[in-house]
């Protein structure tokens, strides 16, 4: 057995599972973004289908709800001509006590080729990837607080689309870092692509102490965090993951860390504003910014389909044995 081999890559260094942006070589990240650029044009055509996954079965296994992420994966798979199956796990065998690996084994017996997995436990997609047959691929659609690699990739794609050269950019990520798998994926991706400066911005209770070890500049004041920024990524306040008194109130949060048109003037004049969604208007971001000229939030959602098409087509085209 090879020492510390990246479980996402085969022996030839090709991507066979997408579990995390962390540890992916820069050339693979760039290849995904380049492939996504080709698929953006497919999504603009009258006939939006390509036959790359014809005859393949894609199972969306969402142990945690997310209508939008699941829908974009479903659209992406269908545009690649795959057969798509959505499993509402909360109402199926898993709720009756069947173990995660039993569920996977049973679905594998139905000739699954690709599992898209969202799970509240960090590491669940890794566990599945270790136990599937060599021809089966796993894509992490979000695991606990750990990672959300396709959201990270679509954020990178959006930044590259509007700003081109990462080595010249200052990117501020603002909000609830403590619970955000998107923030972690964005940070790993930005650092991999050579971003000049990444700032983690938020109150002390929501920006973990270990953030600085990831190579980011930690800022506990919004004004300092977004001053001179080229890109601002606003994060949703994740009330469903919060326990204890991390915040006094959403009104207080908006006063200190909510992005308003006035505060946005501290950033570069051509700065873009992003948000992975869903948006809490009036909590982390003002409606005038969401709907304003510097917002790229809607195009960001559209790019998600092309990025997920790219990931699925790349992993499904590579065999685990390296053939």
From Swiss-Prot:
Q: What is its EC number?
A: 2.1.3.2
- What is any one of the record's Gene Ontology cellular component terms? cytosol
PROSITE patterns, from UniProt?
CARBAMOYLTRANSFERASE
Which Gene Ontology BP annotations are present?
A: 'de novo' pyrimidine nucleobase biosynthetic process; 'de novo' UMP biosynthetic process; amino acid metabolic process
Q: Which InterPro entries match?
A: Asp/Orn_carbamoyltranf_P-bd, Asp/Orn_carbamoylTrfase, Asp/Orn_carbamoylTrfase_sf, Asp_carbamoyltransf, Asp_carbamoyltransf_Asp/Orn-bd
Q: Describe which pathway this protein belongs to, using the record's wording.
A: Pyrimidine metabolism; UMP biosynthesis via de novo pathway; (S)-dihydroorotate from bicarbonate: step 2/3
Q: State the top-level EC class.
A: transferase
The reaction(s) annotated as catalysed by this protein in its Swiss-Prot or TrEMBL entry are: carbamoyl phosphate + L-aspartate = N-carbamoyl-L-aspartate + phosphate + H(+)
One GO MF term on file is: aspartate carbamoyltransferase activity
Entry binding sites for carbamoyl phosphate: 68-69, 118, 148, 151, 277-278
Question: Where does this protein hold L-aspartate?
Answer: 96, 181, 236
Tagged with keyword Amino-acid biosynthesis: no
Q: Write out the entry's keywords from A to Z.
A: Pyrimidine biosynthesis, Transferase
Q: How does it assemble?
A: Heterododecamer (2C3:3R2) of six catalytic PyrB chains organized as two trimers (C3), and six regulatory PyrI chains organized as three dimers (R2).
Its annotated function is as follows: Catalyzes the condensation of carbamoyl phosphate and aspartate to form carbamoyl aspartate and inorganic phosphate, the committed step in the de novo pyrimidine nucleotide biosynthesis pathway.
Extract the HAMAP family matched here.
Asp_carb_tr (MF_00001)
Protein family according to the UniProt entry:
Belongs to the aspartate/ornithine carbamoyltransferase superfamily. ATCase family.
PANTHER family the record matches:
ASPARTATE CARBAMOYLTRANSFERASE, ORNITHINE CARBAMOYLTRANSFERASE, MITOCHONDRIAL
Q: What is this protein called?
A: Aspartate carbamoyltransferase catalytic subunit
